[in-house]
Amino acid sequence: MPSLCYGKINKPMKKLIKNWVHIPGLHCGSVALRDVITYHGYNLSEAMCFGIGGGLGFYYTVSEDISPTRMIFVRGPEMEPTFFSLIDKPTSWRHEKDEDKALETTKEWIDKDIPVLIQTDVRYLDYYNSSTNFPGHVVSVWGYDDETQTVFLADTGFEGLQAVSYEKFKKGRSSKAPANPLENNWIEVNLAKPIRSLCEVIPEALRQNARKMIEGRRGGRGESGVSMIRLWAEDLPNWKDAPDWKWCARFGYQVVKKRGVCGAGFRWLYRDFLTEAEEMLLPLRALRLSQKMDLIGNKWSNMSMILKEISEKEKPDRKLLSLASDKANELWESEQQFYRAVIEIQ
């Protein structure tokens, strides 16, 4: 009589991290940071997470391969890795060329009750109902279900967890859309020890962000820094010759005023961080950094409305473009002065 072989039937796996956290907020990256740091037992505001990560930046990209062809972006590079590098241990985005392997790696961390930050493209998140590519969007992943082929993630201002199919999850993480192509970027958030004192971290975070802005730093979108604000200011009058000048101006308005940037290109979110920092570190109060950043934020808010007005014209308005150029130069001068002062903080 032949022997009988009994094999194990592989059932679809399902996992949701207990006590997952999502506190809806303003900006994808800083919301994701606050969610995962809260999960690990630390009560930090979104503004504090943004500030520690050094979230301020400025990119200006001109290319016929992107839409719009003149694109600004007002957040700095590497905010999420910088945050963890300052509070815990050296951290960088990890990458994986194979999208199936990247998915399995994410599931393995979830199985260990460790949430994962990923970068994705908004176009592949159905709940946004967007046909526009926006790669680099950061969310936190808290669970998966093999039977329904679904992952569960927390995203910015949306309540609760969002269900995303494995197919869309993989496509979003591997999006090659310019100007920020992705390669399944992720950070597993495993804090194995108490984080550093914020009184030590905050001054270092301030100086780091200031140096990045003065010296310039390269990220997935190119170079970020105050020099790019000057370049943008010089080029604004030339927008009249861009075939998509309306979209250039409208997109600029949106990324400064509307797209999760706290109304002023993240400058008011950073102001709120500075206000908290001044409460914790009394010597900072005398420098009036939060008040100075509030004024810079006002200038960014006003700039956004000029861009909006430009976008609503029937044809390029040379006077408005010249005004926008002048205001961008003022921003360059104000930000340069601010960061140079911060670098000198002892």
Language model: regions and residue ranges:
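Noncatalytic regulatory segments and standalone regulatory/sensor domains
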Residues: 146-262
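Charge-dense, low-complexity intrinsically disordered segments
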Residues: 23, 70, 93-96, 189, ...
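Conserved active-site-adjacent core of cysteine acyl-enzyme catalytic domains
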Residues: 13-44, 54-194
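Charged, long alpha-helical assembly modules
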Residues: 254-346
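Short helix-capping/linker segments at secondary-structure and domain boundaries
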Residues: 38-47, 274-281
